[in-house]
């Protein structure tokens, strides 16, 4: 995923292709489009930013219209190449979307390969294992933010935030 991307980008006429029209994908486009990149955003859903709140949707539409962002909806990622994403268009056509910078901002599957071992290793100790984010299940940024807040509450309750 793209969450927390940090890139120094001064400006270019290069191609930026983003796969995933959720919050993070929209943030990537919002960063690069005003800096001169030719942006394309791809999503499997019938609308870019479909799950976004109304204010985000309005801002997105304004940015995409102002900077000529190309949108591919009902379009599925098939392959990631060094300088292109291969996608399947709604009519079944396979197409390469070439990029100078490509971002995979898809919702992913939960990834917690060592969670059981960690829980076993720290069983009967005062260490609490608290799975968060996509280690629990693939989900939205808001839920990850709520997890972060819950962790702060646990740390505060145990006195670890008293600085």
PLM regions with names:
Residues 73-84:
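A conserved short coil-to-beta-strand element within the FAD-binding core of flavoproteins
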Residues 70, 78, 95-97:
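Residues that recognize and position ribonucleotide moieties
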């Amino acid at each position: 995923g793209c969450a927390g991307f940090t890139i120094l980008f001064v400006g270019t006429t290069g191609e930026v292709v983003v796969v995933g029209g959720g919050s993070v994908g929209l943030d990537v486009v919002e960063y690069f489009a005003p800096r001169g990149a030719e942006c394309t955003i791809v999503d499997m859903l019938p609308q870019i930013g479909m799950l976004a709140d109304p204010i985000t949707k309005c801002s997105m539409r304004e940015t995409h219209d102002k900077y000529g962002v190309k949108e591919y909806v009902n379009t599925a990622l098939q392959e990631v190449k060094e300088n292109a994403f291969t996608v399947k268009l709604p009519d079944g056509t396979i197409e390469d979307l070439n990029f100078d910078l490509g971002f995979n901002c898809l919702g992913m599957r939960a990834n917690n390969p060592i969670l059981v071992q960690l829980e076993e290793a720290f069983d009967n100790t005062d260490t609490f294992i608290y799975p968060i984010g996509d280690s629990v299940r693939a989900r939205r940024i808001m839920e990850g933010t709520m997890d972060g807040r819950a962790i702060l509450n646990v740390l505060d309750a145990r006195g670890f935030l008293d600085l």
